[in-house]
UniProtKB/Swiss-Prot annotation:
Keywords: ATP-binding, Cytoplasm, Nucleotide-binding, Nucleotidyltransferase, Transferase, tRNA processing
GO cellular component: cytoplasm
YrdC-like domain ranges (all copies): 4-185
Protein name: Threonylcarbamoyl-AMP synthase
InterPro entries for the chain: DHBP_synth_RibB-like_a/b_dom, Sua5-like_dom, TC-AMP_synthase, TC-AMP_synthase_SUA5
The organism of origin for this protein: Pseudomonas fluorescens (strain Pf0-1)
Length: 185
């Protein structure tokens, strides 16, 4: 992957604890380092979102989630791999390998391997990221940079320019253990 200077700048900011806004497949997202509690707390405060709800982790390839899959049946891994990269988010058991500020009150965590080039480039530099829609709780997700700036002026550390991926709807969310759809696309 060839990382643009903008993506490299965003990666530096994330490593320093920043909360950024960036384009994804369907809507703008907010993201930060999932291991940085202060950054996640800021992101949740910006969105006015409860920590109990949990957050999605996005990556550039399935290997970035290998630490979670050690005890998974191979058919689970194959099922996820067959849908990635793409607009599929899977709820998987986190086995207490992630902090509560990422998982909320759930026994599962939401994982996605993005097919958006900028998101993949960014994750290739920093690893998995928090990815949540760029909107205050209860408001429509931002579909333009202007809306991101209207919602979050002065609250995010960086807005990574770029185009959305062309999808109409956010990703489908399914439970890996049951196959049940939790959120349709």
């Amino acid at each position: 992957m060839v990382n643009s200077w903008r993506v490299q700048q965003a990666a530096r900011e994330i490593r320093a604890g920043a909360v950024i806004a960036y384009p994804t497949e369907a809507v703008w997202g907010l993201g930060c380092d999932p291991w940085n509690e202060e950054a996640v707390d800021r992101l949740l405060a910006i969105k006015n979102r409860s920590v109990d709800k949990g957050l999605i982790l996005v990556a550039d390839n399935i290997r970035q989630f290998d630490f979670l899959f050690e005890d998974f049946p191979q058919d689970w891994i194959d099922r996820m791999a067959s849908t990635w990269p793409g607009p599929n988010t899977w709820l998987v058991p986190h086995q207490n390998l992630l902090p509560e500020w990422v998982t909320g009150v759930h026994d599962t965590v939401a994982l996605r391997v993005s097919d958006h080039p900028q998101v993949r480039d960014l994750c290739s530099l920093v690893g998995p990221l928090i990815s949540t829609s760029a909107n205050p709780q209860g408001r429509p997700a931002a579909r333009t940079r202007l809306r991101v700036e209207q919602y979050f002026r002065g609250q995010v550390d960086l807005v990574l320019g770029g185009a959305l991926g062309g999808r109409k709807n956010p990703s489908l969310i399914r439970d890996l253990a049951t196959g049940n759809i939790v959120r349709p696309a």
